[in-house]
Every structure is written in C-alpha cells, then in structure tokens.
Amino acid sequence: MQTGSQSTPGRNLFLRSSSLKTKPAAFVLPLMAAALLCFIGVGRSSGRNGGRPVPAQDDQSNEVSRAAIENFWTIYHGNDYAGIPEAQRELETAIQSDPNNPTLYALLGATHFWHVGEMTRDPNALADKQIFAQDMPTAAALFQKALDLDYYTQHPIGYINDDHLPGYLGITTVHTGQEYQNQSLIAKGDGILDFAVYQFPEFNNLNRWAAHLDDARDTATYQEALDSLWQGIDACIGTHIDRANPDMKPYLGLVTGVGRKKACWWKGDIAPYAFEGLILNLGNGLVKAGQIDAARVMYANARNADNYETWPYRSVLESIAASDLNARAAQYAPGATKNPPPLNVPNRSCVYCHATVPEPASHYRPTRELRP
C-alpha cells in the first residue's frame, strides 16, 4: 500500500525505437522538448498494458542484446567514460531488433545519466553543451520506457520486477525539473522517489538523497534528503542506528552478496563499492549539517569493507576525513561561498560505486557527430 505522498510511476513517456538513433542536434532538441511535455503530464496513461504485445524474446535469446549489455558493463565497470558512445551505439542497435527488452532502455538511460553526471571528463565539453542539456531528460525518458516494459507488460511466471527502476526514474525526473526550473516536475519526481523507497528502501533511499543533496543545508528538503540516507542504513541493518555514534561494526555479520541487501554492502557485482560510496555521501552530508563527530565515525566505517584497499576513490574519502571538518562545514553556511565542496567524489556521479579500476588516461570520443 502506498502513502498519500507516494506516486506510482505512470506510463506517460513513450520513445519509439526510431527516436533513439543518433541524431543531429537540430533534430534532438524538438524531440526532447516533446518528451519533456509528456513528462510534465501532457500525455497521461492508464497504467494498463494498452494492448502492447508480450515480448517475443528475452536478452538471453538475443545475441545482439546480450553482447550490448555485456559491453555496457565492461565499459561501466572499467571506468571508461570515453566508451560511452560505443555503449550507446550498441544498445541502440540492439533495441531495433529487441524493442521490448527493458534492460536495453535502462542501460541506455544510464549512459546518458553517466555522461552528464561526469561531464568534466569530456575534453569537448564546451562543444557538447547542447548534448549535455539533452542528457538528463533523455535518461528520464528511457528509464520511463524501461519501467513501462518491466512493470506493465506480461512476463513469464517467476519474473522479478526491477525495483531499481523507479529510483532511476525519480532522480532523473527531479534533476530534469531542476534543469528546467520546473517545480511541478521536481514534485513529480519526489513522488516517484517516495514510491521507489517504498519498493526498495535499501537502494532507493540513496537516490532520494542524491536528488536534493545540493539543496541549502537549512532547508527542509536537505534535512529530508539526509534522513533518507539514515533510513537506508536502518533498512539494511533492520534496526535504528545511533545517529550520534553510527558505528557499523556491530552489524557486519549482516553483510551479504545476495538478495536486496547486497545493495547495502560490498559483495555485489553491480556496484562493488556501494558501501564505500554510501559512507562517503553520508559522512559528507553530516559535515554539511554540522554534525562533525557523527561524520568522523561514519568516515571510519568505510574501512570495515573487505575491498576498501582496492577502492579506486579511497584517497578522496581519506583526504576529507583528515581535513579540518569544522572549516569544511562552515563553507555550507548561508552566504559563505557560491561553490561549497561537493558531497560526493568531485565531478563524478556513478563510477565511485561501480568502477572496479582507476580512471584510464584516454581521450574522449565525441558522443554525437554534429552535422549542418
């Protein structure tokens, strides 16, 4: 049962497979404007299957789809930001022959989310400004399509819905609303995130935090976002962790690499450094809130992870933890500075939880070839 504040993700965005092909910028902008209008609620739908055909094949029987999916994970875990265009091309090609596969749309959405979230890695960033502007609404539209297929079409008996998807849709909806300064869209995304947390609190509380981590520290939205991280830990350990002394050593016997709880720890293969990423975010979030003593305990928790020594972004957490945290906290005070320190790895959004290797020294290949 949902609470009144929760919003079930509706089936109100459709991207035909033809719209996913690489297009010149002049054609993409009208496309995304139309997608955004649907997002805001112009094109509502009932939530029924709508007569769409049952998928004729899954990714296990489609070699093109399987190869595209495997290559995405190779690029993603390999910290290969320069490989995003290759991953996009393969996923778009796979969608042409496997258009009812939700995984393809979800991963294609992830490439756009990754692209804009780490745009400083693109040496052509100035030339790609139009592309970055399209990335977030494109990601949201693709996550909506993936969720539609995953939640609202028929599947074989035993199929398990992917409850990560409402979280991805929610956070990209909020960020799209923030990009366009559209308060109703932000509110819509927040409602989707509430539903996502209801479905999968261990994972989606992190998305609810990430949607508002840049809000001013004294706002209700920031306090609620910070509380979402606490709620995520509570869901992981099955009890209410001490907010003043959040030592996680007593709960290490709960570490697992299976089921939903693997999202909490370091045993999962999709996000092997999810635990360290959570600790970094919550520690930094507590510093922003002025809770320095609790932040120090939280930073120390990261060392409990079996794979902490191999975490490619370990030095970021260690340098922050060793710094003057009171001085850092002061930078978040109202009017203190226009550019306070970020609450995650600077200029990184995805890789510090997912990447298994350090960043390669490589040149970025343009995402789109712009033609006159």
Predicted regions and their residues:
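N-terminal secretory signal peptides that target proteins for export/translocation
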Residues: 1-23
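The canonical Cys-X-X-Cys-His
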Residues: 346-358
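TPR/Sel1-like alpha-solenoid repeat signature
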Residues: 105-112, 142, 282, 286
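Canonical tetratricopeptide repeat
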Residues: 105, 157, 166, 206-207, ...
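Helix-start (N-cap) detector for alpha-helical repeat units in TPR-like alpha-solenoids
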Residues: 61, 65, 102-103, 154, ...
